Amino acid sequence: MKKILIYNSGGGIGDTIQIINLLISLHDHYTDHEIYLLQAHQNNLFENLLKELNLNFIKITPIKFMYFGFRFKHYFQINSLVKKNNIFFDIIIDLQSKLRNTIILKKIPHNIFISSTLSSFFLKPKFEIKNKEKNIIYRIVNYIKILTNNKFILKKYDINLIKKIYFDEADKLLPSDKYVGISMTQGNLYRKKTLPFDYIIQISKYLLSINKKPVFLIEKKHFKLKEKIESEIKDAIFPEFNSNINDPCLLISLAKKLDYTITIDNGIMHILSLANIPMIAIFGPTSSDKFAPKIDNIKILSSQKLFNSKNINLITPEIIIEKINLLEKETN
């Protein structure tokens, strides 16, 4: 059977969630190919944290170098590994744009090499690219469409792959309606992506004033934050604190109980996007063009676009409330 290798240099859950629709679409289109995923951090999330998404077709490569592509020594080490394991891929797809990583990745024997690095210099075969999509995944999708004479279709994750136990749990945790999700914690601590606490409180109080129920999507480790919110918003709901289930599939199931969600750029945003529910996504130091989910109804607030600044604090509660009102009109 033929083989496709997808190289993903990101190490977070959000980085992995973002490529799911591409993985599914490749699997459906290239039915005579096996799909292999090479993650630079070797965390194999589809074998553990994301196992319940039931994407069982994804295979792990014999390339086990930690931080693959990020170390110059890999340029020399990959040769002996390739020879020892007789490694060859019909198609290699590069989902990052660092020159060093791409040069090392391209040393793996292949027929077709798809990469946007250095203005698509490493593409094999060569072809002209007119669409300059900023989101690298959708840039790659455009490349594949050209290769397949526009027959390649990007599909969405089917949440019916998730076991019923998660949806049953979501029904218990959120048994009514008029819920609005709020996600305000960030995984990457190197760039400030979190809104000020008082902004969150103002937004929550506004939601209550229009008969909505604020649902905080916060992991149990953030119990101090939960207590702080509860001291200000007595009717706040924290479903994850009332469940023994700790799995991203529960978040996706909870999302289907929400009218919409308000979130910063974090892993939860990408998890919720698999449910394809309406969303207000708030960006500060990160690029909304690169990282905003492609879902049916998303309202993007970017401080870079609105104020030419990476300061997320410039996106005030009043600005967010405008988007809330817009979603209310659209969803009612």
Spans of model-derived segments:
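Conserved nucleotide-sugar phosphate-binding/catalytic loop shared by glycosyltransferases and other
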Residues: N8-G10, Y36-R71, E232-P239, I298-Q304
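Conserved nucleotide-diphosphate donor binding/catalytic pocket of glycan-assembly enzymes
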Residues: I58-I159, Y179-Q186, Y190, F197, ...
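Nucleotide-sugar donor-binding patch of glycosyltransferase catalytic domains
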Residues: S115-S119, K130, H270-N332
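Donor-binding and catalytic core of enzymes assembling or modifying cell-surface/extracellular glycoconjugates
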Residues: F197-P285
